[in-house]
Amino acid sequence: LSSLGLTARAGANPMITGIAVDSREVREGTLFAALPGSRVHGAEFIQYALRMGAAAVLTDAAGAKLAAEELAGSDAALVVSGLPREALARTAALWFGGQPATMIAVTGTNGKTSVSTFVRQIWVEMGLPAVNLGTTGVEGAWAAPLAHTTPEPITLHRTLAEAAANGIT
């Protein structure tokens, strides 16, 4: 994480074996990202993540304050970021590695999945392997469902790395 400008405020210098934003996915050695949410702060799940074996916690100042007691009794490294969601995205990009060199993003209120599907289909007709992500999940060179229409950074970067590994350039 130091290559991203992130340093631990407290805890050990652990060997990270995975990253998770959902405490139910934490295993021994995982970096748990406790992000602020629209209804609940992820820091409310730090105690559970620590019990599951989290070796490090990435959160914001509010999350560190919310979970101060749990973290004080732990060897887990605590990484506090003013922009924890961005820090998680950069961490996930570094963790999963390679991504296709050519990507497009479609924004707006309506038609995003349709437009990205059309672009993928055009690229495939041109002989370019492609996938698109959207409401219908991952489509193209392989298909997979997505839990959210806008995937969390971990899911996004895992999928992009899988695309690169499957020859999507």
Which residues does each predicted region cover?
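Phosphate-binding loop of NTP-binding sites
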Residues: A87-T169
